[in-house]
A protein has these predicted regions:
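Helix-rich "cap/lid" substructures immediately adjacent to catalytic or cofactor-binding pockets
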Residues: 1-60
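Short loop/turn hinge sites at secondary-structure boundaries
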Residues: 19-23, 77-78, 90
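Extended hydrophobic secondary-structure segments that form protein cores and membrane-embedded regions
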Residues: 29-30, 61-65, 137-140
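Generic alpha-helical scaffold signal
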Residues: 34-42, 65-66, 81, 108, ...
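N-terminal, well-ordered alpha-helical segments
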Residues: 42, 46, 69-73, 116
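Short, surface-exposed basic-aromatic patches at helix termini and helix-loop junctions that form
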Residues: 53, 75-78
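Catalytic nucleophile loop
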Residues: 59-74
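Patatin-like phospholipase catalytic region
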Residues: 79-143
Length: 143
C-alpha cells in the first residue's frame, strides 16, 4: 500500500511481518500537535478507539500535544466514536468575534473562548478521562 508508511525497528518489523499489527500489541498511541490538520485523523481515531483497541485488554498510554492531547482525551470518554464526531463538529464550527477595527481576535479572546469550548465539551466528564480503566493520558505542553 503506497498511502501508508510504517516505520519500525528491526524487532518490531519482524513481529509485524509474522503476526500483523494487532490491538494487543499497542502500548502507546501518540497524538501530535497540528491544529486543524489533526481533524483529518477523525475516521482513524473512531476506528482505533471505537472498535479496534476494544479487542484488547492491556493498558495503553495516550500521549498528546495541542489537538493531539484533545484527541487522546476524547478517546478516554464513554462512547468514543460519538465523542470524536462531536469534537470534530465543535472544532469546525468554532467562531471567534472581534472588536470593530481589529483584523483578528486577540490571543486572550481566543484563549478564553477556546477554554470555554473545552469546558463545554469535557465539563463534568473529567473523571471519565482520568479514570479510564485502560487508557492513561499524558499531555505534553510548553510555554
Amino acid at each position: 500500500m503506497h498511502a501508508l508508511r510504517l516505520y519500525a525497528g528491526p524487532q518490531a518489523r519482524r513481529h509485524i511481518e509474522q503476526h500483523g499489527l494487532r490491538p494487543q500489541d499497542v502500548r502507546v498511541v501518540p497524538g501530535a500537535a497540528g491544529g486543524p490538520k489533526g481533524l483529518v485523523l477523525g475516521p482513524l481515531d473512531r476506528f482505533i478507539f471505537g472498535d479496534w483497541l476494544a479487542g484488547s485488554s492491556q493498558q495503553v498510554h495516550l500521549v498528546g500535544a495541542s489537538i493531539g492531547a484533545w484527541r487522546m482525551a476524547t478517546a478516554c470518554l464513554d462512547e468514543p466514536v460519538t465523542a470524536f464526531q462531536r469534537l470534530e463538529d465543535d472544532y469546525i464550527r468554532q467562531h471567534f468575534d472581534w472588536q470593530p477595527g481589529q483584523k483578528r481576535p486577540s490571543a486572550q479572546h481566543v484563549s478564553e473562548q477556546f477554554g470555554q469550548s473545552l469546558q463545554d465539551f469535557y465539563g463534568g466528564r473529567v473523571l471519565q478521562v482520568l479514570q479510564h480503566p485502560r487508557y492513561r493520558l499524558h499531555i505534553v505542553t510548553s510555554r
